[in-house]
Amino acid sequence: MGFVKVVKNKAYFKRYQVKYKRRRQGKTDYFARKRLVVQDKNKYNTPKYRMIVRFTNKDIVCQIAYARIEGDVVICAAYAHELPRYGVKVGLTNYAAAYCTGLLLSRRLLNKFGLDEIYEGQTEIDGDEFYVEDVDGKPGAFRAFLDVGLARTTTGAKVFGAMKGAADGGLDIPHSTKRFPGYDDESGDFSAEVHRSHIFGGHVSNYMKELEEEDEEAFKRQFSQYIKHGVTADTVEEMYTKAHAAIREDPTPKKKTDFAGKTKRWNRKKMTFSQRRDRVKQKKASFLRAKQQEG
């Protein structure tokens, strides 16, 4: 079939149908969403859970959600900006931070449903593949499917770091090792040691050492926050090791405290009825005084 020019006549505009709003905005891939949301017909009202991973310039968002007609329902969420509470104060958007955020999400979710003691996940992190298995006589493992949105799913992408953290934390997420750092596409071999290095920030510490040797000014400029918080290339792995242990110890979200400070008010406070009445009396009195002085 050759090229057919679209004739934009009355019939074209009469039958024209706009795409969904979030497709027009370029925010949702509905081809992928349909497959992530639609549940098997023989499972009736059972929700199909998704592990949603999104990256901003300064944060990582991990959520467990399921779809309803009214909109998606988020049952649990974890953010990279919570990591300073667990000792990770710098590099909140790298691969190691993504792993920590995924681990925090899974431990928080299992704690919420009372499954954290049944499914502990991978306590000794080695970077190798790990799949949680159902325990006989106990509730099944919590199953979720990775939702990466519009992110590119290249080998070594950070979204898979968050997924690996959640899988090691005890969630049942179907996956393979083909997209983890350390996988060689040509030979098909997977190096768990390389992946473990990324989980503990080894790639960051290696770059810190290289940059410090080559250009100290550039090192001070790029790693200024690391220097400020006393994090060196040799202490990066220790920082993440302690963070993993702290997350497992207490994954619950921090309770919001009531605002104790004094609020600033920039506009005038609304007057009461009695205040308005007195104001009118004062204006009348001042007007009469001015008239008397003129007379």
From Swiss-Prot:
The keyword Cell membrane does not apply. GO terms for cellular component: cytosolic large ribosomal subunit; nucleus. Residues 251-261 have a biased composition (Basic and acidic residues). GO terms for biological process: ribosomal large subunit assembly; translation. InterPro entries: Rbsml_uL18_euk, Ribosomal_uL18_C_euk. GO terms for molecular function: 5S rRNA binding; structural constituent of ribosome. Residues 262-271 have a biased composition (Basic residues). Keywords: Cytoplasm, Nucleus, Ribonucleoprotein, Ribosomal protein, RNA-binding, rRNA-binding. The keyword Mitochondrion does not apply. It is found in: Cytoplasm; Nucleus. Residues 251-295 are annotated as: Disordered. Component of the ribosome, a large ribonucleoprotein complex responsible for the synthesis of proteins in the cell. The small ribosomal subunit (SSU) binds messenger RNAs (mRNAs) and translates the encoded message by selecting cognate aminoacyl-transfer RNA (tRNA) molecules. The large subunit (LSU) contains the ribosomal catalytic site termed the peptidyl transferase center (PTC), which catalyzes the formation of peptide bonds, thereby polymerizing the amino acids delivered by tRNAs into a polypeptide chain. Component of the large ribosomal subunit (LSU). Belongs to the universal ribosomal protein uL18 family. This is Large ribosomal subunit protein uL18. It comes from Styela clava.
